[in-house]
């Protein structure tokens, strides 16, 4: 399961860099865990080159922490076999169960589904495996005659699954009579901070978008003993904010330089992120924390992004091989739509009632000011499994 979490986190960083290429100076927010899960449901039925490409993009066939020459790496990827694949699905079953454990301190809901043209019969083995490993099953629908109604039905289903926060996942004209298979996924999270911000301490402050431009934001403030970590290259400082019960954390990476975000994004790798955010690197400080309140909602049609990352065959009617899913010769993935929403406020993410427990560690610790008044990266992490659930870049609240 550890190697699967590593794969998901590596995929998160690779996807973030790819999305950043076409979103310079813009906010980014997505759930890498949700996208990985839903793509793996499709990977369950992929064969041949289609499966190999998907495994590569999802980082399944990468030796964790092992470096080798390009030729050896290429050979090893070709040898990625069925037993590895079955282990991945079994690990996903365990990981999903662990992450989605019922918890009174936060709400985490995921919505994953495949909608397939009803004239394409799915293999019983695929249906059984999908239910066993992912607790889901494909929905047979009539794209040929009722494509727009199906689009509306899918949107309604996702909206229900995410407490009304994810609306209109599939835009107008995104589904038509030629659609054969659509993968949809969304993740909803509502959590309360271990230490909540006092509303009366929130004031209007400038957020510096760059050296010449700033905008007024509602800046929250607290003074607490919190965990800080320092990054030497490029110069940045990180902070960990626990949610109640400490199962989940918000991790913030704040460049020292106002214009340092791009440099930090380019430098970040899974190995470095793991090192920076490890318990060994965390130090307890008396922190004067300034953090903007913000809402982010981002929608992505990931077809072109995932294709450019290396899994183009899955989207090709002539090349896609989903023979593990169905005997139909021209079954291919039409689109992968993803939408994620987050609200950071005094209580936590989303407006939530209740008071956070106060834990006061009565020891003398160094003090530091952490002023998130310029662009930064943030992650929401499931701590027990070390899995990144959400990745975000805040350039302008």
UniProtKB/Swiss-Prot annotation:
One term under GO cellular component: extracellular space
GO molecular function: serine-type endopeptidase inhibitor activity
UniProt keywords, alphabetically: Cytoplasm, Disulfide bond, Nucleus, Protease inhibitor, Serine protease inhibitor
InterPro entries linked to this entry: Serpin_CS, Serpin_dom, Serpin_fam, Serpin_sf, Serpin_sf_1, Serpin_sf_2
Organs and tissues of expression: Expressed specifically in myeloid cells and the bone marrow.
Motif range (Nuclear localization signal): 74-77
Compartment list: Nucleus; Cytoplasm
Annotated S-S bridges: 68-395
Site (described: Reactive bond): 362-363
Family membership noted in the UniProt record: Belongs to the serpin family. Ov-serpin subfamily.
Function: Protease inhibitor that may play a role in the regulation of protease activities during hematopoiesis and apoptosis induced by TNF. May regulate protease activities in the cytoplasm and in the nucleus.
Protein name as it appears in the record: Serpin B10
Gene behind this protein: SERPINB10
């Amino acid at each position: 399961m550890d190697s699967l979490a590593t794969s998901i986190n590596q995929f998160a960083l690779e996807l973030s860099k790819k999305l950043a290429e076409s979103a310079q100076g813009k906010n980014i927010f997505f759930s890498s865990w949700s996208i990985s899960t839903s793509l793996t449901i499709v990977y369950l039925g992929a064969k041949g080159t289609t499966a190999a490409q998907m495994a590569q993009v999802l980082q399944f066939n990468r030796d964790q922490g092992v470096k080798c020459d390009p030729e050896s790496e290429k050979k090893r990827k070709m040898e990625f076999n069925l037993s590895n694949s079955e282990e991945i699905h079994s690990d996903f079953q365990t990981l999903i169960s662990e992450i989605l454990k019922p918890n009174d301190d936060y709400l985490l809901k995921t919505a994953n589904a495949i909608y397939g043209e009803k004239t394409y019969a799915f293999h019983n083995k695929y249906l059984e495996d999908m239910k066993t490993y992912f607790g889901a099953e494909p929905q047979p629908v009539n794209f040929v005659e009722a494509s727009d109604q199906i689009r509306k039905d899918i949107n309604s289903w996702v909206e229900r699954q995410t407490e009304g926060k994810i609306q209109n996942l599939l835009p107008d004209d995104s589904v038509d009579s030629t659609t054969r298979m659509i993968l949809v996924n969304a993740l909803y999270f509502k959590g309360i901070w271990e230490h909540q911000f006092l509303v009366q301490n929130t004031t209007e402050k400038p957020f510096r978008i760059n050296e010449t431009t700033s905008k007024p934001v509602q800046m929250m403030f607290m003074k607490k003993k919190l965990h800080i970590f320092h990054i030497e290259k490029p110069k940045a400082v990180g902070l960990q904010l626990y949610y109640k019960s400490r199962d989940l954390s918000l991790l913030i990476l704040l460049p020292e330089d106002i214009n340092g975000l791009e440099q930090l994004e380019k430098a970040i790798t899974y190995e470095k992120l793991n090192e920076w955010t490890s318990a060994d690197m965390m130090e307890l400080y008396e922190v004067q924390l300034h953090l903007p309140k913000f809402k982010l909602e981002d929608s992505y049609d990931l077809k072109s992004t995932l294709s450019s990352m290396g899994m183009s065959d899955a989207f090709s009617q002539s090349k896609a091989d989903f023979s593990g899913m169905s005997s139909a010769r021209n079954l291919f993935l039409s689109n992968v739509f993803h939408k994620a929403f987050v609200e950071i406020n005094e209580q936590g993410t989303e407006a939530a009632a209740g008071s956070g427990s106060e834990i006061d560690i009565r020891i003398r610790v160094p003090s530091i000011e952490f002023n998130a008044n310029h662009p930064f990266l943030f992650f929401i992490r499931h701590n027990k499994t070390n899995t990144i659930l959400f990745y975000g870049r805040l350039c302008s609240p």
